[in-house]
Amino acid sequence: MTKPQINLQDAFLNQVRKENIPVTIFLINGFQLKGMVKGFDNFTVILESDGKQLMVYKHAISTISPLRPVNTSFSENKPI
């Protein structure tokens, strides 16, 4: 059997979406967007900010910074 491929990006985005964790998205041009992730696919992230929805293309994103730590199944502390 093959191991399932770990998709950390999807796990992270899904967790901030499900837990309504506010995020700051830093774009490659230096611009910052603050809001809540409402959805995502392979190419875009839907961000709700100030009552508006923004579709942000992933290729324009440099960093996504959550307001608080995100617990994904891949980042849990496991004994060595």
From Swiss-Prot:
Keywords: RNA-binding, Stress response. InterPro entries: Hfq (IPR005001), LSM_dom_sf (IPR010920), Sm (IPR047575). The keyword Electron transport does not apply. Homohexamer. Belongs to the Hfq family. RNA chaperone that binds small regulatory RNA (sRNAs) and mRNAs to facilitate mRNA translational regulation in response to envelope stress, environmental stress and changes in metabolite concentrations. Also binds with high specificity to tRNAs. This is RNA-binding protein Hfq. It comes from Desulforamulus reducens (strain ATCC BAA-1160 / DSM 100696 / MI-1).
